[in-house]
């Protein structure tokens, strides 16, 4: 299956001390997925999110951050096999918390940024109603209780960042990054599964001369358990 997601977010940040920043945000999400397997089809999702985060400098080279977010989404699902076609509209609610410890060690034209991150998210799906069509007959009384889905993950990610247009990463407006990734996940639905795996990511970022705008693109590939995942993430940010 493949998914394309467009996200927008507005955030407000303030320094509450010399080494601590607090922020909060509101945002929206539009996602479109193609489903493959025994049933094939598509799913669209429109969602709204809100949350807060904090970043604290524990020392000159060690930083801690944490976040919490909540969201609600409306989903439209269409899928079918050779006999049965199913459609559904349903609402989900999600809550996520997480945090990370990140180091920053400068070595002339590159920096080493080891990171250990943890996140836990839970999605409430509940009863999902379906309309089914087969052999010219329609049944709109179909339903399934999907319950909840929770996922906990731990990621170790030693990132290396190179300066492309200056002698140090801090002075560079263009940067190249690479990071191997080591991941363990625990997913709970009606049953619980645990898997670990590894992957890698490569990124390219660019900042404006005034430091108010930035853009970056990242390519991520992971193998966790028997699942292969690949992502392309493009991000644009502007500070007012």
Regions found by a protein language model. Name each.
Residues 1-240:
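Membrane translocator/pore-forming domains, dominated by Gram-negative outer-membrane beta-barrels
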